[in-house]
């Protein structure tokens, strides 16, 4: 699938082989692999599907389906967490998915860029759901960022995702306490930031 930027691999198994190391040895003189583009869960699963099915159509279908399904699911979970009725939550999630800005973005079929629109609502939902349980907040927030590590491949979008988490935490903290308790807000931020660093240490090292 040639999506946005026109350099998306068609063969996920070959991509996994080419980008699983800290050094790209096949691109001219070589370059440092600064992001987990070949070692994320997405490529591992797509490569597995490709090898099990022996049919590239299945892996590509799963890719396109997941690019559109996960943003919808993330926003639906957020809407249900704030006690919207199922139909209202469905409509909110559907609008999030099909509004012109998001739909045009997803139509590029660039999973590394487009996945950030799924990551942000998932992190909002996890922060809201486990706000009062520090251990679960730490674990599920960190695990989700690791699973979606490929969404941080585009570094400016990675910054946007982390800023979104900070803003989400501010909103949730105010919502839970009915006022802004800055000491608690800072404590929660340290928890999610620590979770992000610890669970993603395996690829963050390449940035330094």
Ranges and model annotations:
Residues 54-58, 84, 150, 184:
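Juxtamembrane loop-transmembrane helix junctions in multi-pass integral membrane proteins
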Residues 31-32, 174, 178:
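Amphipathic alpha-helical interaction segments
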Residues 69-82, 86-176, 188-208:
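Membrane-embedded helix bundles of polyisoprenyl
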Residues 18, 133, 179:
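Extracytoplasmic
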Residues 178-185:
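Membrane-interfacial, low-structure loops and terminal tails that flank and connect transmembrane helices
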Residues 8-11, 129, 184:
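Intrinsic disorder/low-structure terminal segments
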Residues 1-72, 94-118:
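Membrane-interface coil-to-helix junctions
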């Amino acid at each position: 699938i040639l999506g946005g930027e026109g350099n998306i691999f068609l063969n996920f198994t070959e991509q996994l082989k080419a980008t699983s190391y800290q050094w790209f040895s096949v691109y001219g003189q070589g370059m440092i692999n600064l992001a987990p583009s070949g070692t994320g869960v997405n490529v591992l699963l797509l490569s597995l599907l490709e090898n099990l099915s022996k049919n590239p159509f299945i892996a590509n279908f799963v890719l396109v389906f997941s690019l559109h399904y996960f943003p919808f699911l993330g926003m639906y979970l957020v809407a249900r967490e704030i006690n919207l009725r199922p139909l209202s939550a469905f409509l909110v999630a559907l609008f999030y998915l099909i509004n012109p800005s998001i739909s045009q973005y997803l139509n590029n079929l660039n999973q590394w860029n487009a996945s950030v629109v799924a990551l942000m609502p998932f992190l909002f939902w996890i922060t809201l759901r486990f706000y009062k349980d520090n251990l679960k907040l730490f674990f599920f927030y960190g695990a989700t960022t690791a699973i979606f590590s490929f969404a941080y491949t585009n570094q400016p979008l990675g910054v946007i995702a982390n800023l979104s988490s900070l803003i989400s935490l501010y909103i949730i903290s105010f919502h839970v306490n009915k006022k802004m308790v800055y000491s608690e807000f800072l404590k929660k931020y340290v928890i999610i930031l620590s979770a992000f660093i610890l669970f993603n240490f395996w690829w963050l090292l390449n940035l330094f």
